[in-house]
Structures are given as structure tokens and as C-alpha cells.
Amino acid sequence: MFISEIQLKNYRNYEKLELSFEDKVNVIIGENAQGKTNLMEAIYVLAMAKSHRTSNDRELIRWDEDFGQIKGKLQKRNSSLSLELNISKKGKKAKLNQLEQQKLSQYIGVMNVVMFAPEDLNLVKGSPQVRRRFLDMELGQIAPVYLYELSQYQKVLTQRNHLLKKMQGNSKNEETMLDVFTLQLIEHGAKILQKRFEFLHLLQEWAAPIHRGISRGLEELEIVYKPSVDVSESMDLSKIKEVYYESFQSVKQREIFRGTTLLGPHRDDLQFFVNSKNVQVFGSQGQQRTTALSLKLAEIELIYSEVKEYPILLLDDVLSELDDYRQSHLLNTIQGKVQTFVTTTSVDGIEHETLKEAKTIHVTNGTVDCEIDRE
């Protein structure tokens, strides 16, 4: 799949923009704070209906405006689709071929993207929240039902935490309501956990050989899920629910005392092992970056295996963060099969066949000039 054009209105520092793209490589060049990352983000938001940079949608709307809009034309193997996302203070509305989608979960997954930005290099050594977000965003693209369960879980979690805060003063009158929220949380949480196990099993299958290739056969990568309760991938849904129920019963008084939910998918984490050593603790910066690169390349192949089309790859100021070897490995892997967007302050020092026939887009303070290089 590839995006052939995009239109922005009141998006970040873009008042109005119409731009067409090549189906292979597009290089976006500009100094810092000119709008190249905003353009990259707009493509991501069009696909995912949320930003990878902020959870506050108001930040996506141009200063002093009430709404922002992103439109795009997506070319898939057997169809051409128009996508539209309207952002206002009231929320977001998505359209597919001019038809408004009742739920964002019906819209997300139509256009698949993989974002690789400098912050993704922190996937290994960053906070557990970074790794959970990675799981949620990637899994949501190939399993819309996961996004539904996640949104329901988050609603119940907010209500349950509010009740636990209230119960810190007087717990006796609210225990029945707490039990209701606990059962609802278990219902959604168990399904989230099961989907994460399934996804990570697939990710492991793709990431391990990719990592082996990048490390020239010297390293074996293993991805381990660390749940907040004693469950395993082999358990069925009913067993996971049973373990959750018993675990919540055992921490009930502690949760009331603390005023917050102590168990569940929102407390889980991922660990990465290279040659049986925890990369987060014992890995070199090079191993951590190889692990992050392996995961991103694995995402591309995993999405292809699930939807039978390659996703769009967004490389936001990340090539300069990789050494020549990892840079070449990345570009060799995607060459000719994945529509790729690259942002950079300069192409100097990036010598690769993939960039030779790229469309070059120069961004200066929210305006663009385009050219196609044919060297």
C-alpha cells in the first residue's frame, strides 16, 4: 500500500497544504522546527487517529483555529481509498470514502504505518509505558477488536481508580461497586492479555531471525512478556480470568489503602534478552539499538503477513542516529517494497541506492518545494 497524496488544513504549523508522493521513497528535508516532523506526524495521525508525540489532540490544531483536518488518498492492491480525519475541541471524526465511521476502531487499520523515530531507540531502555504503547499501537493496527477492549478497559480503570480514592476514607459502603468494576476490568483485561501474548509470539518469530542477520549471526533475541499477575501464554481465557480474580482478591485491601489499581495490563512490561542477558540492564548501546531496529523491521514483516500488504514506513530523523552498518541494513531491507518517508536536515553522508530516485520535499516554515531526483 502507499499514500499518493495528502491535504492538510490548520494542522500544526500548516495553514493549508496539498502534496503528492512517490510510491517508493520520499525524502523530507528541512532545518529543525520548520515542519518536517509535523508532516510526518500528519501521515501517522491519518492512519492511527492519534499522534505518537502527544496525547492532547488540541496541540494538533493550528494556533488560534478551532479545527484541523487531514485528508489522504490511499492506494491498496485492489482499491483506492480516501481517508479523512477532522480534529476539533470536541474530539475526532473519521471518514472512509466520504462515509463517517461510527467508531475509530472501524477506521484504524485501513492504512498501516510503522513509525521509527529517535524516541523508538528508547524502546529497550525507556519506561514500561513506552513499551506498552508500542504494543498497543502496533497490535491495534492488525486487530481492531483489541482497540475496543483497550478503550473499555481504560474507561473501567478510570472509574475503579476514582472509586478506590473515594474508599480511602470509608471503604465499607462501596465494596459492592468495587467488585462490579473488578469483574469488568478482568473481563477486558484478560482479552487484552491474550491478544498481547498472540502478538508477541508472532513478533518473536519475525524479530529473532532479523536480529540474527543484523548481528551477523552473533546474537539471539528473545522477547519476554512480564505480566503483573502469574499468568502464562499457555493459559486459556477462563484460566487467565481466574488468576486475575484471585490476584485482585489478594490485593484488595492494599488497593483501597493506596487508592489505585495495582494489577492489570496497564502495569505489565516487556523485556528483551540477547544471548540470555537482559539488554535493558546489561546491553551496550549498540545492542539496544539493534534490538529496536529488529523490532521495527519485524513489525513491517508481521503486518505484511497479516494484511498481505506492506505498511508505510516513516523514518523521522532516525537515520542520523544509526551507524552506517545499521543504516544500510535498514535501507537494504525495505528497498523497492515499502513506501518510505525519510526526514532529515541533510542527505549528506547518507549514501544509498534507495535514496537516489527519491522525491525530495524541502520544508521551510510550513511551506514546501518538491523535486524528483534522477541522478
UniProtKB/Swiss-Prot annotation:
Transmembrane segments: none annotated. Keywords: ATP-binding, Cytoplasm, DNA damage, DNA repair, DNA replication, DNA-binding, Nucleotide-binding, SOS response. SUPFAM superfamilies: P-loop containing nucleoside triphosphate hydrolases. It is found in: Cytoplasm. GO terms for molecular function: ATP binding; single-stranded DNA binding. One of its GO terms (cellular component) is cytoplasm. The keyword Zinc-finger does not apply. It comes from the Bacteria. The keyword Nucleotide-binding applies. Belongs to the RecF family. This is DNA replication and repair protein RecF. It comes from Bacillus cereus (strain ZK / E33L). The gene is recF.
